[in-house]
Amino acid sequence: MVQTDWWTLELESMPGFDLAMKRVYAWFEGAIIDRPPVRFMAHNAFVDQANQAYPSGDLRDRWFDAEFQVETFIKSIEGQTFHGETFPVFWPNLGPEVYAGFYGAELQYGEVTSWSIPLVRDWDDVARLKLDMDNVYLRKLDEITRCALERCAGRFLVGYTDLHPGVDCAAAWRDPQQLCMDMIEAPERVKALIEIAIRDFETIYDHFDSLLKEHRQLSVSWMGIPSFGRMHIPSCDFSSLKIGRASCRDR
């Protein structure tokens, strides 16, 4: 990761931000400035508090409440100083299968995650898969992102959502258990479905990245490791359901 297009970012909760970024960039190059990067994270640390505080019992309402999501995060970092390479990052989150929702799948919401209702019940349903950039989930992610951008200056970084194209998206469309069977019974159809699930990735990524870069934000998501350039975390959670040669071949 070469240090290019570097700009100054002042964060009141992280006075050592610039040096922390230099350590991260050095680590990617296999080098050390003064020590390796160190960070401290408790994933979903404030979820229980958020659940108790929300006035409605409708989980979808809570996930979709942009003001509440941003305010909850801000309260969670009040009075804190971020040490080492632990960065204060808010990233808009509608669940790991939201990528499938961009094509028409409906999401159901739980306390800490969401999941897709299978959209491709029959192989003929593949013809229905079209990216909709005006989709309810894309519009909501934009709203949450903009809400955070309005309040982040000097306080925290704003990132982009957890994107799972490819195999994970195909599994969300088809149902993970069914896709396991499909890999045995219809491997060519599976391959074609995965191709559809990844072909629009750059368009989707660029949509969110452009919005962040317009506001001089870095590229960062759930992992909490920022980049001044373009950064994405490749994901294939579905691989945990597969073993042997099929797993190695399709991953």
Predicted regions and their residues:
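Active-site loop segments of alpha/beta catalytic cores
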Residues: M1-D48, Q52-Y54, S76, H83-P92, ...
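N-terminal glycine-rich cofactor-binding segment that shapes the pocket for flavin-like pterin cofactors
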Residues: D58-E71, E78, F90-M133, K140
